[in-house]
Amino acid sequence: LAALVAVQPDAALAQIKKTGASAKKEDVNRRRDDGSTPLMLAVYNGDVAEAKRLLRAGADVKITSKYGATAMGLAAETGNTEMIRVLLEVGADPDSPNPDGMTALQAVARTGNVDAAEALLRAGAAVDAKEKFGGQTALMWASARRHPEMMRLLIAKGADVNAASTDRNYQRHVTAEGRPKSLDSGGLTPLLYAARENCSACAMVLLENRADIDLPDPDGVSPLLVAIMNANWDLARQFIEAGADVNHWDIYGETPLTTAIDLRNRIDGGHASIDPLNKATGLAIVKLLLERGANPNMQFFFKPANVRGAMTTRGVTPLIRAVFNNDSEVVKLLLEKGADATIYTADRQTPIHAAIAGRAPEPQAIELIKLLQKAGTDVNVIALVNHPEEIRGGTALHYAVRKREKEVIKLLVSFGVDMNAVDQDGLTALDYTQSRGFMPFMALQTPLYKDEAALLRELGATRLMDKSPTWPVLGPPQGIWEDIWPLGESAVHEPVYKHD
């Protein structure tokens, strides 16, 4: 080149310009270690002027990094309308899916930038494209991120309001680990996302555009049930008044009524924080559900995976849950609306068992027992052993003795409880006062209850086992599957599992 400059300076200059231009063109598309380009960096930083300069210099808008990122995808993630328009003008793909299939429109939908979404849609972006992992659409993303105006735009452009994300259908049990798995199963609709995120405005947009109000997830959970699970009473009222099925149950048999009863007066915590702006109350929703025809005698098919604590076994009714929660107001309401106080669970626990085993202090338990006995609950039903719940069963008297509630004992005797009835371990209530029972939750034998023993004998109890049982160190054996989940007619009250 130096020799050429000395002999033909004009030719040398031309060659320098040509080489420089070539170098410059190659430079604007140079790759970093991750495969990204200067254009991608400019887009990521929102530097429109730099992006335009690079594009004029020949930057390739369609280059993909090693991780599948594109300039358009990066612009969409930030919802940069001007940048998106610049890229579209030079031929960028309006969909620009990443390796997971997420499109630019889906990314923009998450930001809520309606202008950016309009630009992509005008350029031909697919409104109902689904990403590969979750099968979610732009409308689902907009609903999940609480962007009702974005949802209006997408629906106006033809988005499917009833589309569902991928049902992953995870295996719920494996050979080596038999407990139920709490896994995100997918299968959510835009309305389910709105309910999950407590977005009333999003729900209204969908309902105005004829979204199916009862379309559930793969576990049978409806939008109404989700709203109640979140203790979002206002949204629950909105769904009920819009015509939601108040008797829609999930795969466990859990209904909006049972869930509302639990969440209005939940004893074990763990539920969503209640919006202080909620105008409706849990009690108002319970009343509204009953007014709209909710079945007060609906029972659990199985113990729900998302409900903790005792009295959550098969056959549990709304009444039993309300009693266990010491919610006398709802108990009275349910009885007025036709709740059957004679129905018991698959392990034969009655509402009176629930009153004693629940969280009610003794005075409140007594009031509940009086209500239930008047409504027909039999004090002599013998509950069965339930291993998962760590319950040894027995009559209501067995339960009262184990809790050492003397006034409850007197009340039950006045109601005609059989003082000499035996539980499945062959023990009477009097046996329990003699340290012959077993407390599974503590893995200990029951202590000696002298005062309760004296009271029972005074009231007429006479029967004792001939000899105290010898319990294994860890307590009674766990039993076979039929013992754990009793299925026989002898274990199931006739009305159990009859669902309207």
Language-model region placement:
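Ankyrin-repeat-protein effector appendages
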Residues: 15-20, 24-27, 34, 157, ...
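Bacterial N-terminal signal peptides
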Residues: 1-6
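Ankyrin repeat A-helix N-terminal signature
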Residues: 41-47, 74-80, 107-113, 141-147, ...
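N-terminal segments that cap or nucleate solenoid repeat domains
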Residues: 15-63
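Ankyrin repeat domain, specifically the short helix-to-loop turn at the C-terminus of the second helix
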Residues: 22-26, 52-60, 85-93, 118-126, ...
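Ankyrin repeat boundary/linker residues
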Residues: 32, 65, 98, 131-132, ...
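Start-of-repeat signature of ankyrin repeats
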Residues: 35, 68, 101, 134-135, ...
